[in-house]
Amino acid sequence: MYSSCSLLQRLVWFPFLALVATQLLFIRNVSSLNLTNEYLHHKCLVSEGKYKPGSKYEYILNDYIRFLAAGNFRSGSMHMTSGLKPNAVTILYQCSGDSYNSKCRSCYAAGISGLRRRCPRNKGGIIWFDQCFVEITSISVIDFNISKINYENNFPLHNPNRVSGNIKSFNNETMALLKELALKANNKDNMDNGKMALYASGEKRVGTKKVYAMVQCMRDLVKPKMCKECLESIIKEFPECCDGKQGGRILGTSCDFRYELYPFLRTSDSKTV
């Protein structure tokens, strides 16, 4: 079960005994024992208002949705933005680095369906799943700022169960792993489809157990320098988000991280380093 200040999410977790060790191992592929595409959270951007049935906004929105759905989802991220208010439309999605291609397509479809159900006729909304997030907004192409990190929509989730043993050491070791992955994600040698991957995953042995983790930035909008800044910022929130928790994550639209005490990434289509 995940929980936050205002949200409880049902997920299956494995018990963990936290022990201190120093061995750090980065892996290219992590097998998955608990592979899901669970709904995690959504946010209706009510300040953007609603659109009317049959309106020009609805026509543009549906046209963009179909256009993105016809793509190959090979890069794992995409955005489209066009027009001026009141009919400006922007759609973007980002899939997890291990869920590109067909898995990304399926998650995008789930995101669009979920937004229509949870934020009916809202001009703006964001929805997160295990494998992706999808955002729709009425921000115009002129106002859509791709050079600014968005922290407003960050949302923490964590396992309510705490690790046993030395909590301080567990926190320090897990944060060290996340920081190392942030550096890997921004390494110029970490390329994918001709662009910096801005994604990394790895595992860290702690006694007889392992902590598995990943970090990622929105590839289609976030520049490498911004990615580093974004990841550093949310990792600093670890003590408030995930202090001594058996698992946790911070969702966002510019960057995110996740750690668990079990493998949670796919072996195929993996972008791990």
UniProtKB/Swiss-Prot annotation:
Residues 1-32 form the signal peptide. One of its GO terms (cellular component) is extracellular region. It comes from the Eukaryota. The keyword Repeat applies. CDD domains: Gnk2-like (cd23509). Belongs to the cysteine-rich repeat secretory protein family. This is Cysteine-rich repeat secretory protein 30. It comes from Arabidopsis thaliana (Mouse-ear cress). The lineage of its organism: Eukaryota, Viridiplantae, Streptophyta, Embryophyta, Tracheophyta.
